[in-house]
């Protein structure tokens, strides 16, 4: 995806403050949102579920941080412990 394509996607998804205002329907738009959100996490740091939720709540306004957390995990952008108590940015 080029920078221009990414900018076009975000025109209707993100407000001027960088807050995601809606969850997109198209797969490539969802991926762009997830890649944007993962930049809000520090690599190498471990986060509690509460911390992950707080970060996601800060960067979206449509009220479904659980969806975003699941999507980040399902798309291999974050990893977690089996008991879901700790999360971290997936590193390849």
Tell where the protein language model's regions lie, with residue ranges.
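N-terminal regulatory modules of eukaryotic gene-expression and nucleic-acid-associated proteins
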Residues: 1-5
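Beta-rich nucleic-acid/ligand-interaction surfaces
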Residues: 73-74, 89
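A short, conserved structural fragment
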Residues: 74-83
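Short acidic, hydrophobic short linear motifs in intrinsically disordered regions
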Residues: 43-56
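Short, cationic-aromatic polyanion-contact patches
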Residues: 84-92
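Amphipathic alpha-helical segments within well-ordered protein domains
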Residues: 35-38, 53-57
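Short alpha-helical segments that sit at the start of domains
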Residues: 7-43
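Short amphipathic alpha-helical interaction segments
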Residues: 59-71
């Amino acid at each position: 995806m080029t920078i221009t394509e990414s900018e076009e996607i975000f025109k209707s998804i993100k407000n001027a403050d960088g807050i995601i205002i809606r969850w997109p329907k198209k797969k490539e738009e969802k991926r762009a949102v997830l890649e944007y959100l993962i930049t809000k996490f520090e690599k190498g740091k471990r986060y509690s579920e509460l911390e992950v939720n707080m970060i996601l709540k800060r960067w979206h306004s449509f009220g479904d941080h659980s969806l975003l957390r699941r999507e980040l995990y399902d798309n291999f952008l974050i990893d977690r412990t089996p008991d879901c108590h700790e999360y971290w940015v997936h590193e390849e």
